[in-house]
Amino acid sequence: MNETIPGSIDIETLIPDLMIIIFGLVGLTGNAIVFWLLGFRMHRTAFLVYILNLALADFLFLLCHIINSTVDLLKFTLPKGIFAFCFHTIKRVLYITGLSMLSAISTERCLSVLCPIWYHCRRPEHTSTVMCAVIWVLSLLICILDGYFCGYLDNHYFNYSVCQAWDIFIGAYLMFLFVVLCLSTLALLARLFCGARNMKFTRLFVTIMLTVLVFLLCGLPWGITWFLLFWIAPGVFVLDYSPLLVLTAINSCANPIIYFFVGSFRQRLNKQTLKMVLQKALQDTPETPENMVEMSRNKAEP
C-alpha cells in the first residue's frame, strides 16, 4: 500500500525531491564560494581554469535540479514545447560539460607528470581557456542537434534513423570521455606507485583522485542509464529517475566538500581562511615531511 501525505504527495517522490533540494542548496553555496575565490581572489593556473569551469557547471546543474524538484513538490507542470526542451537540454549540456571538464583535468595532470619538460616549456599558454570554451560550445551543440534530429525541438521533424545514429554518436562521445578519464587516472596511479620513486603525493593529486572517484560512484550511473536505456525501453523519460538524480546532486555537491577536506587536512582551521584552504587543496607541490599528506597512514611522516 503506497504511503501518501496530505496534499496527495507520494512519499517516494517527496523524499528524493527533498534530498535533491538539501544537497542542491549545500552544493550551490559551496560551488558559489569556489567560483568566487577562483574567479576573483586567486591567480588562475592551468588547473584552476578547469576547476573554475567545473564549479560553474556544477552550480548551474544543481540550480536546475532545485528548480525541477521544487516544481515537483509544488505540483506545478513545466510548460510544454520549447521551454521544456530548453530546460532539459541545459541539464544535459551541464552534465556533459562536467564530465568533459573532469576528463580534461585528469588528462592535464597526466601530461604534467608524464611529460613535465614539454608541459612546462612547450605547452601553449592559453590551452586551458581555449579547451574550456571548446567544451562548452561542443556540449551545447551536441545537445541542440540531438533535440533537432529527435524531434524535441520541432515536432514536425523526426527521423528515427538519424535520431538513432546521433544517439549512438553521443553515447560514443560519452564513452570516449569516460575512457580518457579512466586511462589518465590509471596512468597517474601507475606512475605514482610503480614508475617513480621520487614522485610524492600532492594535495592536487589527492583532490583529483577523490573527485574522479565520487564521479564514478555518483555521476556516471545517470549518464549510462540516460543513453543506454533508450535502446532497452524506448520512450522512457530517463531524467525522471529519482535515485539517479539524487546521486548526480551528491556528485555536484561533493567537489567543494572535497576541496575543503583536502585543504584543511592536518591544518589548524582557526588560522585558515577559505581562500587558504582552497589554495592548499589545489597545491601541486609536495609538502615538507612534517606536514605531508599521507593517505595510507594515520600519522605524519617523521
UniProtKB/Swiss-Prot annotation:
Q: What is this protein called?
A: Mas-related G-protein coupled receptor member A3
Entry function: Orphan receptor. May be a receptor for RFamide-family neuropeptides such as NPFF and NPAF, which are analgesic in vivo. May regulate nociceptor function and/or development, including the sensation or modulation of pain. Activated by the antimalarial drug chloroquine. Mediates chloroquine-induced itch, in a histamine-independent manner.
Predominant location: membrane
GO molecular function: any one?
A: G protein-coupled receptor activity
Membrane spanning stretches: 18-38, 47-67, 82-102, 130-150, 168-188, 212-232, 243-263
Bilayer topology reads:
Multi-pass membrane protein
Tissues/organs with expression? Expressed exclusively in dorsal root ganglia and nodose ganglia. Expressed in a subset of sensory neurons that includes nociceptors. Expressed in the subclass of non-peptidergic sensory neurons that are IB4(+) and VR1(-).
Please state which protein family the record places this protein in. Answer: Belongs to the G-protein coupled receptor 1 family. Mas subfamily.
Q: Write out the annotated subcellular location.
A: Cell membrane
